[in-house]
UniProtKB/Swiss-Prot annotation:
GO terms for molecular function: metalloendopeptidase activity; RNA endonuclease activity; zinc ion binding. This is Endoribonuclease YbeY. Gene3D superfamilies: Metalloproteases ('zincins'), catalytic domain. One of its GO terms (cellular component) is cytoplasm. Zn(2+) binds at residues 123, 127, 133. GO terms for biological process: rRNA processing. It comes from the Bacteria. Binds 1 zinc ion. The gene is ybeY. It is found in: Cytoplasm. The lineage of its organism: Bacteria, Bacillati, Bacillota, Bacilli, Bacillales. Belongs to the endoribonuclease YbeY family. It comes from Shouchella clausii (strain KSM-K16). Pfam families: YbeY. Its cofactor is Zn(2+). NCBIfam families: rRNA maturation RNase YbeY.
Length: 160
């Protein structure tokens, strides 16, 4: 099980959509066999705010659809094992999603808002677990896992 902290101060999403985010993350955690109790936060924001975060943290001066900030990565001094020793959940990190991007991309790809939302949630979650798409092999592995999770949840490309 994964504890999900949702931050939707702009009240962009309905209660059903927020529940979908929690359900999809718990499903994804099962699909990747995440055995340790973990925690993740998901923030829903504007295009302007995600643009600022992208510029500040990645040096890319444009908005994006989703950003992930893993607490346990190679560049961090953070030691996640102390949580386990104390019986606390493993803090995976933060996912930030641009709601205007969800709306636009759902329309562009011809599927539902919920399918696009779930896609970006799973994409961000996999980044927190160390998946990436910096080269062709990594991209294939990550995107295959992403689609498997969405398909098994019932939000595959043909089902949305």
């Amino acid at each position: 099980m994964i504890d999900v902290e949702l931050n939707d101060e702009g009240q962009f999403l309905s209660s059903e959509q927020l529940q979908l985010v929690k359900d999809v993350l718990n499903h994804a955690a099962q699909e990747v066999s995440l055995s340790q109790q973990s925690e993740v936060s998901v923030t829903f924001t504007t295009e302007e705010d995600i643009h600022e975060l992208n510029r500040e943290h990645r040096g890319i001066d444009r908005p994006t659809d989703v950003l992930s900030f893993a607490l346990n990565d190679e560049t961090s001094d953070f030691d996640p094992t102390f949580h386990e020793e104390l019986g606390l959940p493993n803090l995976l990190g933060d996912i930030v999603i641009s709601v205007p991007h969800v709306e636009r991309q759902a329309a562009d790809y011809g599927h539902s808002f919920e399918r696009e939302l779930a896609f970006l949630v799973v994409h961000g979650f996999l980044h927190l677990l160390g998946y990436d798409h910096m080269n062709e092999e990594e991209e294939k592995q990550m995107f295959t896992k992403q689609e498997e999770i969405l398909q098994s949840y019932g939000l595959g490309r043909s089902e949305s």
